[in-house]
Amino acid sequence: MDYKETLLLPSTTFAMRANLAELEPQRFKKWFEQNYAYEKMKENRKNAKKSFTLHDGPPYANGHIHIGHALNKILKETIIKTHYFKGESVRFTPGWDCHGLPIEQQVEVKLGEKKKSLSKKEIREFCRQHASEFVDIQREEFKDLGIIADWDKPYLTMKFEFEAAIYRTLCEIAKKGLLCERSKPVFWSWAAKSALAEAEVEYQDKEDYSIFVAFDLDVKACEKLGVSKASAVIWTTTPWTLVANQAIALNPNENYVITKEGLIFASALLKSMVEKGLTSGEIQKELNAKEFEKLEAINPLNGRKSVLIMGEHVLMDGGSGLVHTAPGHGEDDYYACLKYGIEVLMPVDDSGCYDETLRAKGLLPSHLLEEFIGLHIFKANEKILELLGEKLLHSSKFIHSYPFCWRTHKPVIYRATKQWFILMDEPKLQGKTLRECAKEQLLKTTFYPQSGVKRIGSMVENRPDWCISRQRDWGTPIAFFRDKNTKEVIFDDELFDFVAAIFEKHGADAWWEFEIKDLIPTNSKYKAENLEKVYDILDVWFDSGSTFNAVLNSGLYDAGEKRASMYLEGSDQHRGWFQSSLLVGTAINESAPYESILTHGFTTDEKGQKMSKSKGNVIASEYVAKTYGVEILRLWILLSDYSSDLKISDNILKQVGEQYRKIRNTIRFLLANTNDLKDLEVKEFSFIDKWILSRATKVFKASKEAFFAYEFAKGFSLLLNFLSADLSGIYLDISKDRLYCDSENAQRRKSAQVAMALMAKELLNLLAPNLSYSVDEALEHANVLIKGDAKDVFDLSLTQDFDYDFGIDDTFLMSAREKFFEQIDILKKDKIIKSTLELNLNISFNKFPNEELADWFMVSQISNENEEILAEFEVENEKFKITKASLCKCPRCWKLQSKNEETPCLRCEEVLKGVQC
């Protein structure tokens, strides 16, 4: 007889091999047809008591998505779905940042020389087309990753109504008195010919000069100091700015010496000056810094006067203690000179070259003007050093961290120009400053990880006023009018509203296309001929910082609550989007636009190195999807500590693939062994089933709590350990005998099946937010007792607790099992046995049912017969004797319980009677 035909072997149509790369696109297509998945999620939770809104930080509509984009969007979508399966109403409106330098630069490359002949309107139209093209490209690339969002109704910062909303936000800030136009040094990208905000600057190592220059004090100054001659020795790392020197700053709290050579240094730095060979160190006089205040020195380059001033910014950690001060080229310099009413000179044009200011202000001798006017500043350093002659006391080169433009990757400069600023320290918000209010809001915000609040807090504490103006073409205009005669900017509600309405209908292009008379109301008190336009555009960080107002507060989108539950981006956005949104939100609403902030790290190769094409270590999300499957990409993210940088490589993805197979095969085993289950009624669970259900209760609860706290790696670690060690490693293995060999309706078999069905149901619920594709697929092959009324994954829920804790203390059994298998390893190694079914276990206690104890140790039976003892061990004073089973092997179940060879054991004999009937 072929006994195999009599076994109740597992059966399921749920495939062992997932074929993810091949099959995922088909399922994703179904999810996105008529926005099926997202709309169903909305419909299923329309009566939910709680809601969760994740406001999407907009990527640039420029280029294809990379692995970092995939990390970001998958993490967002997983959190959205976590809240959905918790029973909450969710909203996820994706968006794109469509303005700004990255897009404009790409268009410039496409247009080449043709750009020079185009109007601003035409250039902006090319930018709009470029952005539209990449919105469509990126949207499809995100959908290829199975990311569920409101893809049919995204927000685009270049939409007409959006530009109007950004402009209205700007006007609100202006009306609060927080907007100011002034000439001030700002980061300037000469390569992009535009001002930059702090968030648009990245720091790299750069080699520069370190020079010490003697500025001779004039006769009056020497007389006042009671010396025949003296020279202020300044230190600088930017020789090219010396032509614009207006002052020399000293620290008011320090003492300064005049050496025997007549050189002035800070007392605290005299020793280092001696070491550099600048002086012998012999002191002629020592005075407090304030004794030098308002004395005048002579600039050796041009003979112009340079005033000695006090500056708290002057440090004693390097240099001479006297700082070269050019108010047009440094923020500290600017503020220090402002107190003394010193003129700001700016002899550098927008492309980083010296301009006619050199001639107009006499900043260089006339015979040098032709050589220097039009010369790029970074090519002037050596020439300046040569001109200094003997006044150059010391020169060396050093490498330091220097600001670079984030897009052109060229070093930036400080350049004083007229710019628009949002003021950080004016008490305009109910007597408080924007800085104070923003810091208060941060304390009310939940951060994941918690360290984020300190990081952004220190940035807000120390940041300067926000420069929001740019001198480019593609962006939202700072659409204000200026009085032609007085040059005063006009802040008028009627004008604001009229321009906003025009933008809403015609887009911000109207600012360039329309004449002034068409941009003001017909009966306006202002006359078009007396007005002129401000043509600067807004920093793109203002655009994105205003998105909460344009998306959540405008009513134009079904995007959820007016205040986002969460903002989620890379950790670099502490200085970017998180901060710009905080400042804009606090300025107009006196409230942060978010309740919580979650940050993730960046993607690196397996060695922790940044990915780059030149290194050949780039792994694209498309490659992962087509090679391994999106589900593997998702699991890689969820198994990683996303708060730090995430390493990715083929080796790592293969390891993740193994973990995925472990999950999939466990689900498959559970489905296959519950296929013929008719109901979930069981009189009483067997001890082993109570044990696994108790373990599952603890693990499922802990995993769920971890997932709800966005600690996905922790949740999966708990879950995978349970699946490997307890479920697959013990329970499923020891349950095979009763599942396959007991009769179909046997109580022991039914108990195991019900336990498995309950665990399978909860496991699918737990995995639904994280591995939605696999769960959706599994449901198609699951017993109705597991899937219930669910037509697909979006009908599942995590609202019910899995509560099957029978209070089992398994300490004794787990310890006994461990010691048992230590002995088994020895017996197998010595080739005494091949299988534990060749054994019986002899015990003297009666704590557990013998039949279940035999299953626990996977022996043929618990016996008290005098059989050959092969090994023994002890646990908690209870003795275990491993003996050689004396009965014959059952040809059906393979246990040594038969009285005769080739004869079924009593259990199998009874089962076979039922089969034959």
Swiss-Prot record:
GO CC, one annotated term: cytosol
Residues spanned by motif 'KMSKS' region: 610-614
Binding sites annotated in the UniProt record for L-isoleucyl-5'-AMP: 569
Motif ('HIGH' region): 59-69
Keywords for this protein: Aminoacyl-tRNA synthetase, ATP-binding, Cytoplasm, Ligase, Metal-binding, Nucleotide-binding, Protein biosynthesis, Zinc
Listed GO MF terms: aminoacyl-tRNA deacylase activity; ATP binding; isoleucine-tRNA ligase activity; tRNA binding; zinc ion binding
Alphabetized InterPro entries for the sequence: aa-tRNA-synth_I_CS, aa-tRNA-synth_Ia, Anticodon_Ile_BEm, Ile-tRNA-ligase, Ile-tRNA-ligase_type1, Ile-tRNA_ligase, M/V/L/I-tRNA-synth_anticd-bd, Rossmann-like_a/b/a_fold
Binding site for ATP: 613
Pfam short name (any one): Anticodon_1
Assigned EC number: 6.1.1.5
Top-level taxon of origin: Bacteria
Subunit details: Monomer.
Function statement: Catalyzes the attachment of isoleucine to tRNA(Ile). As IleRS can inadvertently accommodate and process structurally similar amino acids such as valine, to avoid such errors it has two additional distinct tRNA(Ile)-dependent editing activities. One activity is designated as 'pretransfer' editing and involves the hydrolysis of activated Val-AMP. The other activity is designated 'posttransfer' editing and involves deacylation of mischarged Val-tRNA(Ile).
Protein name, as recorded: Isoleucine--tRNA ligase
